[in-house]
Amino acid sequence: CRDSQALSQPNVPKKNSTTAVSLAILGLVAALLAWRIVATNMAELIVQDGGEDAAALALNWNKKNAQAQFSEGLRIAKANPADATAYLSSAIRNNPTDGPAYAAIARLKEDNGNLAAAEEAMQAATQMAPRRVDVQLEAARFWFRRGDIARAMGHMDVVLTFGDSLRDELFPVLLNLAEDPATREIAHAKLLKQRITWWPQFFNYAAAKATNIETLRVLFQMQTGGPNAVTTKGLQAYLQRLQRENLW
């Protein structure tokens, strides 16, 4: 009878043991979460600090840090294009809206001769970063290399609109296109069908720097009657150039 009563008693030690295991698991999970937070924060700090080995050090803390993957991909791009592409692809997986990473992949694909993949990557880059000046400038240069001047100028418009500090550097490129009869129309005529915020400044630049007065005349005609009508300063610059050439 005593034996049957003993058997019917609850096993208190088992309950205590289960509770202890649960607490241990919770403690382990909390520790892992805390470590993950520390590792993530350390990786971010290292990347922000910069330095030649910053990306590699950051990846030691957090292998999924997209910025570190991007930076490491750029660092080794020339020496090891395959590994660079792998890093950049991982950066995109961890940050699918990373326009600069797509642009970097496009350049690697272009250098490797895979032009279809390069075009696809560059298109993704500009879609993900529609107003990032660095990405749009890379896209403009890409399409210039591909011979698609009209498409390149569409990206150049974004660059010159949002990156006005680059105008002094890029206006000579645009003027060269305007000076060449083979590229003048395709580079500027289509663009001038819409409002271009930087056009008045460029026209004034062209009035002063164009080597051929015919270039200026054509640009003047292109803008006439459209949304980029000549400004007062532009007209003055145009007339002054005509006077300088003894044509007015």
Model-predicted regions and their roles:
Residues 31-53:
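Hydrophobic alpha-helical transmembrane segments in integral membrane proteins
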Residues 57-58, 90-91, 124-125, 159:
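Canonical positions in the second alpha-helix
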Residues 60-66, 96, 130, 164-165, ...:
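Short coil turns that delineate tetratricopeptide repeat
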Residues 68, 101, 135, 169-170, ...:
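TPR alpha-solenoid repeat register
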Residues 78-79, 112, 146, 177, ...:
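Structural motif corresponding to the intra-repeat A-B loop/turn of tetratricopeptide repeats
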